[in-house]
Amino acid sequence: MPNEARIKKRLTNKALHYLGRYASTTARLRQVLHKFAKRKLETAEPKDIEDAIEAVIADCQKFGYIDDQNFIDSRIRAGRIAGRSERQITQKLLQAGIDREMAQTSLNAHREGYAQAEWLAALIHIRKKRLGCYGKERDPDPEAYQKQMAKLARAGFGLDIIKQILSIDSIEEAENLETEYRHNMPL
């Protein structure tokens, strides 16, 4: 049976190795350490493992290896740049183990320039997915238009933004709007 110091040492090594490879949240690191302990430290007492995991997580937070707020901020910026809607960004944060309240608080803080951010995300999305003015058909029939609207709605964009984005006539106009929003948006 491994002693407490050895348990903590192995968990610390695993945490540092994992954090050296991936940006992580506290919740995700906790999952990784529990999974590791279940596989590699099966003879240890569950209470010792739990205490060691909490100590390792506290050490990682103290030294700045994991910082949930920094993780959230970087994911919000990356999501905006990638053309994700606020709903998609929220879902990604929840999947990463961030609690809903913390995610909403951070999104509210980043909401300055929100309309422009959603517009920019929608413009990037239609460019990447070849929808609207970037699509094959410049004036799609009503059925194709409905399909494009559905794709944007599934991506988490609101109906008002969808209609305005799909009403853009030319690629040049879309690119000009994207450039304007990029320069005016606080990321």
Language model features with spans:
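An alpha-helical, amphipathic repeat domain used for nucleic-acid recognition
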Residues: 1-187
